UniProtKB/Swiss-Prot annotation:
Reaction equation(s) it catalyzes: N-(5-phospho-beta-D-ribosyl)anthranilate = 1-(2-carboxyphenylamino)-1-deoxy-D-ribulose 5-phosphate
PANTHER family: N-(5'-PHOSPHORIBOSYL)ANTHRANILATE ISOMERASE
Origin superkingdom: Bacteria
Name the record gives this protein: N-(5'-phosphoribosyl)anthranilate isomerase
One Gene Ontology MF term: phosphoribosylanthranilate isomerase activity
GN (gene name): trpF
Xref: CDD domains: PRAI
GO biological process, one term: L-tryptophan biosynthetic process
InterPro entries per the UniProt record, alphabetical: Aldolase_TIM, PRAI_dom, RibuloseP-bd_barrel, TrpF_fam
Pathway: Amino-acid biosynthesis; L-tryptophan biosynthesis; L-tryptophan from chorismate: step 3/5
A Pfam family per the record: PRAI
EC code(s) of this entry: 5.3.1.24
Length: 207
């Protein structure tokens, strides 16, 4: 896959100025985390404000971890999200009930676990591969083990887990993902993006 066609999602946004800078850089999607245990959590009230000026063709992705059905529906009703991203132990039945395109994040340790998720979540828009962690649900800064990704997966996958300006080109060249998802690798602190790191990340991919 040509690195110039890699789709890019910047996740864990909490500030309007960071979202605007990401848009100016040409990213494809913005991730908002609706999970109170996350340092990057945003309230519905704040989310309404910071997504206000996002233009067409930049997707808003709501990132959720084992949410209540009613909370997901509230987000759909209140925020103009294009995609839901489930980062917990949600079942395929739970994910599909909202009639909204969704991404299922998994934290696999083996190729078999990846293939099993692709089979189970057959109607997901994509599978997101993130680093296993006993403490955090994404945003750990730990690099995913690229060697366990099976060849010729039948579903598009998004590569996450410890991506930054130093390793992103190697990751793309080795893994050929449909898209990449970066969070801690472009931050000054959790939820606060570093604009220099953001621009360097993009430059590493697109030149």
């Amino acid at each position: 896959m040509n690195p110039s066609r890699i789709r890019i999602k910047m996740c864990g946004m909490t500030r309007s100025e960071d979202i605007q800078y990401a848009i100016d850089l040409g990213v494809d999607a913005i991730g908002l985390i609706f999970y109170p245990k996350s340092a990057r959590n945003v309230s519905l009230e704040k989310a309404r404000i910071i997504v206000n000026n996002i233009p067409p063709f930049v997707d808003i992705v709501a990132v959720l971890v084992n949410p209540e059905q009613s909370f997901v529906q509230l987000i759909i009703n209140e925020i103009p999200v294009q995609l839901l991203q489930f980062h917990g132990e949600e079942s395929s039945e739970f994910c599909r009930q909202f009639n909204k395109p969704f991404i299922k994040a998994i934290h696999p340790k083996t190729a078999i676990q990846i293939q099993s998720a692709v089979d189970e979540f057959f109607d997901a828009s994509a599978i997101l591969l993130d680093t296993p962690s006993d403490k955090e649900r994404g945003g750990t800064g730990l690099t995913f083990d690229w060697n366990i990704i099976p060849e010729n997966l039948s579903k598009p996958y998004i590569l996450a887990g410890g991506l930054n300006e130093s390793n992103i080109l190697e990751a793309i060249t080795m893994c050929h993902p449909y898209a990449v998802d970066v969070c801690s690798g472009i931050e000054a602190s959790p939820g606060v993006k570093d604009h220099l790191k953001m621009s360097r990340f993009i430059k590493a991919i697109w030149g």
